[in-house]
């Protein structure tokens, strides 16, 4: 029997100086990516369910400030009332962000993640599954690529 985790998904487009950017995510693409997430996490008997999906008002933030993952996640999560769901923010691609998203179990006011758009369902879903791993307190797996046994782990979700 698998455990179900309810998600509240916000499709959050960006704006810069009042000029909105086209949304990359939609509730339909979120559902497609979540199918990839659930295929990955099914091995651990964990299923994620979108309880609610909403198109959020654009977040007006300069492009140069978007790659500060902690700050961005705090700004995103402070825009909404905390509840008993896991909040997921799906955002457009972010220039110079070194990761696919960010997650903080101790984010203010609640545990939350954001995932940037990669342009295809498999990459979007894998990045989302990775961030959910962080919300379940999983750390990155450090790999020594010179070690053949460790290098074989490069496809591990948490690398």
Where are these regions (language model features)?
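Glycine-rich, flexible loop segments associated with nucleotide phosphate handling
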Residues: 23-32, 79, 149-156
